[in-house]
């Protein structure tokens, strides 16, 4: 799956789109994707000057975006009518820094799926070395219902 299809699925845009390519997807089971990390990423200006390191929370966000792609493709959802929200992250661990020039591999595996709720395990690696991991809880909602709820509050 190339960047064009990813842009059709996810609402995220620069500088917050953190998935560049999906290389494997088994609907309802697992997904493998990549994020190419370059020195041009805006977060490197302040994290950390002179020693650029990708913020761990953005690695988790990349895994969450990959989870959303897996949910959309598993259920053949229309992304113009649906949104996926991250509900929680458990057991997040950061093992090694991610640096400019790294290719971040994102691996998502479905732990459980019931209705609109997805629980996944996410693993981020660089050159086969584990850099971050966690369990993700996400929900898929109707865009119209979400807009109506926001207007009512």
Swiss-Prot record:
MF-aspect GO terms: (3R)-hydroxyacyl-[acyl-carrier-protein] dehydratase activity
Record GO biological process: fatty acid biosynthetic process; lipid A biosynthetic process
Catalytic residues, chain numbering: 47
Coiled coil: none
Gene3D superfamilies: Hotdog Thioesterase
Record's catalysed reaction(s): a (3R)-hydroxyacyl-[ACP] = a (2E)-enoyl-[ACP] + H2O
GO cellular component: cytoplasm; membrane
Pfam families reported in the protein's UniProt record: FabA
Swiss-Prot/TrEMBL keywords: Cytoplasm, Lipid A biosynthesis, Lipid biosynthesis, Lipid metabolism, Lyase
Major location (coarse): cytoplasm
UniProt EC number: 4.2.1.59
Keyword Lipid biosynthesis applies: yes
SUPFAM superfamilies associated with the record: Thioesterase/thiol ester dehydrase-isomerase
Localization (cell): Cytoplasm
Family recorded in the similarity comment: Belongs to the thioester dehydratase family. FabZ subfamily.
Function recorded in the entry: Involved in unsaturated fatty acids biosynthesis. Catalyzes the dehydration of short chain beta-hydroxyacyl-ACPs and long chain saturated and unsaturated beta-hydroxyacyl-ACPs.
Stated name of the protein: 3-hydroxyacyl-[acyl-carrier-protein] dehydratase FabZ
Lineage of the species this protein comes from: Bacteria, Pseudomonadati, Myxococcota, Myxococcia, Myxococcales
Gene symbol of the encoding locus: fabZ
């Amino acid at each position: 799956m190339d960047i064009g299809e990813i842009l059709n699925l996810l609402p995220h845009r620069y500088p917050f789109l953190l998935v560049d390519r999906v290389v494997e997807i088994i609907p309802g089971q697992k997904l493998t994707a990549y994020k190419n990390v370059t020195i041009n990423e805006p977060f490197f200006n302040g994290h950390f000057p002179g020693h650029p390191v990708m913020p761990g929370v953005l690695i988790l966000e990349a895994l969450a975006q990959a989870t959303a792609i897996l949910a959309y493709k598993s259920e053949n959802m229309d992304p113009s009518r649906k949104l996926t929200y991250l509900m929680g992250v458990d057991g997040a661990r950061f093992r090694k820094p991610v640096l400019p020039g790294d290719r971040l591999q994102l691996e998502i595996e479905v732990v459980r799926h019931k209705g609109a709720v997805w629980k996944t395990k996410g693993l981020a690696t660089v050159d086969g070395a584990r850099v971050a991991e966690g369990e993700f809880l996400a929900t898929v909602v109707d865009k119209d219902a979400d807009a109506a709820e926001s207007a009512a509050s």
